[in-house]
């Protein structure tokens, strides 16, 4: 899903949404857009939600869901002339979450120190995207993008403390031009700086990953697109980067698109990818257990080849169009940072891949309007994700083998009513290897089904809606291991593979002033 914020020039002058649920969640968001003149416009986005009602339906003294309070806002500006366009903005976030045991779940029985988890995060980021058309006849243009962010996150997992402060600066200079009708060239320069400052008491022995980490990456790239006719497009690119941590590396890629007929589109791609892993910021959820964390060696940059093919069918059926999309993606890791929870049920080991690690994902979806206003969509995704854990090739734990989706949507002829229903099927998978002498969980987890539905009534400028989530009321039984003794070596709250809350009902109101 590709999500983009509304552009100030295109957004409605005012949109407001308020929402409440049976789980005690209250949320409100608003968007206001202002067109100051023909060239300059701005928009303000605000969101706040509060979900601080305690839930402990299974009576294990641990909250089924964190108590949460969050505020975020963004101010976005848009400036445009016939040859120049600029988009800039600032975003802020303040997020507070509390989980574990609280006075509500202990019911006043606080004879021992409660196991409380808290996470406070504050974030600010700014960005600016600027483009200048040099020659409209050749679609020749130059663009400059710059962004920066600061993230402050302070966490407590009972007696464990983990605080991380992240800073990022990114800049990119891009050039594009067409050479005739068949050839297009794009080239550019990139710079990225990441800095992590970490404080706490969560690692068993020293590792370079625990110190303050800073990485500078400078890169250059070129991309050539060949379109000999309306049916065929070939794009090939190469980039080279220099990292202050990993030195030089090159990243090639190629994409092919072929419109075989008016109803069949084919695509194929191949390329290489690299990624620097920051173990603790990316895996802080592991601290919600008594597992000890070990980094066994200096961790290398992750490296993988990626391949993909896809086909889209648009078939006329009884004066309507049946749309079918099928795609397959395969990732083959040359190196990967492995998080091994199988070697020891009381520890997590991080090390470089020594063996094979692959991911094969196949997805197919189809949609068809059965009759006026009624659309049916079905989708199925199969995932085969394997890695080498301590010399053994196994499927990735806590990962479903498949997911399936069936949605039905009906809108009345006058568009006053809309009814939506979604059924989601989640396949089972493998659990981390339990303790053979004292197994506290099974080796696999089962498949499960969830149902959600919503009805909307529209009026001229406002609408009301109501619905429910997880209407099948499926819940994972006792997701917290050894909840009765959270300071024991067996305690583990990360073995979560399904929903921990039952059904939720909700209702809301939307109001908007449309753009004239």
Task: Mark where each language-model region is.
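N-terminal periplasmic accessory domains that precede
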Residues: 1-17, 30-31
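Flexible loop and strand-edge segments within Gram-negative outer membrane beta-barrel domains
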Residues: 51-72, 78-142, 148-166
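C-terminal beta-signal and adjacent terminal beta-strands/loops
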Residues: 274, 376, 425-432, 456-516
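Outer-membrane beta-barrel transmembrane domain signature of Gram-negative proteins
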Residues: 113-134, 142, 148-235, 353-354, ...
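Gram-negative outer-membrane beta-barrel transporters
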Residues: 229-230, 329-332, 352-434, 510-515
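Repeated loop/turn-to-beta-strand initiation elements of outer-membrane beta-barrel proteins
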Residues: 13, 39-42, 83-86, 135-142, ...
């Amino acid at each position: 899903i590709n999500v983009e914020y509304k552009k100030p020039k295109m957004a409605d002058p005012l949109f407001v949404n308020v929402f409440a649920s049976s789980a005690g969640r209250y949320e409100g968001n608003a968007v206001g857009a202002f067109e100051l003149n023909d060239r300059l416009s701005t928009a303000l986005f605000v969101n706040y939600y509060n979900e601080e009602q305690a839930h402990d339906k299974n009576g294990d003294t641990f909250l089924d869901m964190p108590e949460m309070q969050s505020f975020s806002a963004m101010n976005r500006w848009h400036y445009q002339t016939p040859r120049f366009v600029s988009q800039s903005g600032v975003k802020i976030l303040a997020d507070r979450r509390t989980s574990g045991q609280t006075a509500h779940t202990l019911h006043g029985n606080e004879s021992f120190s409660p196991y409380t988890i808290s996470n406070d995060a504050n974030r600010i980021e700014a960005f600016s995207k600027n483009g200048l058309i040099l020659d409209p006849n050749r679609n020749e243009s130059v663009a400059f993008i710059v962004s920066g962010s600061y993230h402050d996150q302070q966490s407590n997992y009972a007696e464990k403390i983990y605080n991380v402060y992240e800073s990022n600066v990114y800049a990119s200079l891009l050039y594009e031009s067409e050479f005739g009708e068949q050839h297009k060239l794009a080239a550019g320069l990139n710079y990225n700086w990441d800095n992590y400052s970490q404080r706490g008491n969560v690692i068993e022995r020293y590792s370079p990953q625990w110190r303050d980490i800073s990485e500078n990456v400078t890169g250059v790239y070129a991309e050539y697109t060949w379109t000999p006719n309306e049916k065929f497009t070939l794009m090939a690119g190469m980039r080279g980067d220099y990292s202050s941590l990993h030195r030089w590396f090159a990243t090639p890629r190629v994409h092919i698109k072929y419109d075989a007929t008016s109803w069949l589109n084919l695509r194929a791609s191949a390329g290489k990818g690299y990624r620097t892993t920051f173990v603790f910021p990316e895996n802080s959820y592991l601290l919600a257990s008594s597992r000890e964390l070990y980094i066994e060696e200096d961790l290398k940059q992750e490296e993988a080849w990626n391949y993909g093919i896809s086909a889209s069918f648009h078939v006329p059926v009884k004066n309507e169009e049946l749309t079918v999309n099928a795609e397959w993606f395969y990732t083959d890791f040359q190196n990967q940072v492995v998080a091994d929870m199988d070697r020891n049920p009381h520890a997590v080991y991080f090390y470089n891949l020594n063996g094979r690690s692959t991911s094969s994902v196949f997805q197919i979806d189809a949609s068809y309007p059965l009759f006026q206003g009624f659309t049916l969509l079905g989708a199925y995704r199969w995932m085969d994700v394997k890695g080498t854990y301590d010399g053994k090739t196994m499927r990735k734990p806590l990962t479903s083998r498949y997911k399936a989706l069936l949605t039905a949507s009906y809108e009345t002829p006058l568009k006053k009513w809309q009814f939506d229903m979604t059924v989601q099927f989640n396949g089972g998978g493998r659990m981390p290897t339990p303790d053979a002498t004292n197994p506290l969980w099974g080796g696999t987890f089962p498949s499960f089904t969830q149902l959600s539905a919503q009805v909307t009534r529209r009026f001229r400028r406002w609408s009301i809606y109501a619905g429910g989530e997880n209407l099948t009321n499926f819940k994972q039984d006792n997701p917290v291991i050894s909840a009765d003794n959270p300071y024991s070596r067996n305690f583990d709250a990360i073995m979560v593979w399904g929903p921990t809350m039952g059904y939720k009902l909700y209702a809301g109101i939307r109001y908007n002033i449309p753009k004239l």
